[in-house]
From Swiss-Prot:
It comes from Prochlorococcus marinus (strain NATL1A). This is Anhydro-N-acetylmuramic acid kinase. Gene3D superfamilies: 3.30.420.40. The keyword Iron-sulfur does not apply. Belongs to the anhydro-N-acetylmuramic acid kinase family.
Length: 378
């Protein structure tokens, strides 16, 4: 079955589209990518998305027009990736504007902006969208949803395997081994903390918007990370919350960056970027240390996906700090890093079409199996 997946993440840099052919057992599918397309948001759209996500108040008219524009851009990406409309289903995540983690006294919340019925009619195809609301209604965080699909896409090894996504936010999937006493264990997943969100903001600020990200980690590699400050940051209570846990740009965004910059004082942009990038690697390393400390789980391999996997400085820091773990890009096992999340939502859309529910208890914390996504027919 052919499915088109559309994804735009918390980095808000654009839309990734992937056309996939799925066959076989939905839990262990065979899949083949037939085409891909990536659309970069115009700077005006990206700025508006980030500003609204950071709390900018806009009128109802502006809100509607932003939703229409994002929907139309997703339609453009879909048509470009699948010009003959061969997909039986189109799965579209929409653009996240706000995410609220579950608190003891308050349910979680997550807002993705997309007009699903409009997209279905623009494409004249079945659309699956609104993937997070059922999970949240069932007491879950609604994130990280990629962890629900990773095992099906990458499979198991003879030891514990991790999949790390480095988008705006870093999240981890922990996949049990295929043999031994742990083979009946559950797949785990959680949001770790900031990845590209802080670094991208800092790069833009420190270069007066001449750069929007640290390509290949070139700026970070010229700086010296402030390790004492990083050790202090790692004591943030969020990093000690037991999974399932989730977060977003509203927690690790502009205001958080300003607070951390104040603590760092007057330092060069290279030292700033190096410190923030090393901070991300340290968060992951601390999570893996705690995974062994509290659950006696030690990874043999960590596959890295997302834009951060192209950051050579960050990849070196991960290998340095995650002792005894083989760290490598997910591309090396045939999963295209840039399109992994689009592939995930294509998979969830395929499962929705088939009526396949997923048990998210150990990943999002939702209390019952869920059929992810809402179907709209044209």
């Amino acid at each position: 079955m052919r499915v088109l997946g559309l994804m735009s993440g918390t980095s808000a840099d654009g839309i990734d589209a992937v056309l996939v052919d799925f066959t076989g057992d939905p839990s262990k599918p065979k899949w083949q990518i037939l085409n891909t397309f990536s659309y970069e948001y115009p700077s005006s759209i990206r700025e508006k998305i980030i500003q609204v996500g950071q709390g900018l108040k806009i009128s109802s008219k502006d809100w509607l027009e932003l939703a229409e524009e994002i929907t139309e851009l997703n339609a453009f990406a879909a048509r470009t990736c699948d010009p003959d409309s061969t997909a039986e289903v189109v799965g579209c995540h929409g653009q996240t504007l706000f995410h609220r983690s579950v608190k003891k006294s308050k349910r979680g919340g997550s807002l993705q902006i997309l007009l699903g019925p409009l997209l279905a009619n623009l494409l004249d195809q079945i659309v699956i969208y609104d993937f997070r609301s059922k999970d949240i209604a069932s007491g879950g965080h609604g994130a990280p949803l990629v962890a629900l699909v990773d095992e099906a896409l990458v499979g198991r090894l003879y030891g514990w395997r991790g999949v790390l996504n480095l988008g705006g936010i870093a999240n981890l999937t922990i996949i049990p081994p295929k043999t031994g006493i742990d083979k009946t264990s559950q797949c785990l997943g959680w949001d770790c903390g900031p990845a590209n969100s802080l670094v991208d903001l800092a790069v833009k600020e420190s270069t007066n918007s001449s750069l929007t990200f640290d390509e290949n980690g070139s700026l970070a590699s010229l700086g010296i990370p402030k390790l004492e400050i990083i050790d202090k940051w790692l004591r943030d209570p969020f990093f000690y919350l037991e999974p399932p846990r989730s977060t977003g740009r509203e927690q690790f965004g502009f205001q958080y960056l300003q607070k951390r910059k104040k603590e760092l004082g007057d330092i060069s942009k290279e030292d700033l970027i190096s410190t923030l990038t090393t901070f991300t690697a340290s968060i992951i390393s601390q999570d893996l240390d705690n995974l062994f400390k509290f659950k006696q789980i030690r990874l043999i391999e960590l596959l890295v996906a997302g834009g951060g996997s192209k950051n050579l400085f960050l990849m070196r820091q991960l290998q340095k700090q995650c002792c005894g773990v083989h760290v490598r890009p997910i591309n090396e096992i045939g999963v295209p890093s840039q399109y992994r999340e689009a592939l995930v939502f294509a998979t969830l859309s395929w499962w929705n079409f088939l009526g396949k529910k997923v048990n998210p208890k150990y990943i999002t914390g939702a209390k019952k199996p869920i059929l992810y996504g809402v179907r709209v027919d044209p």
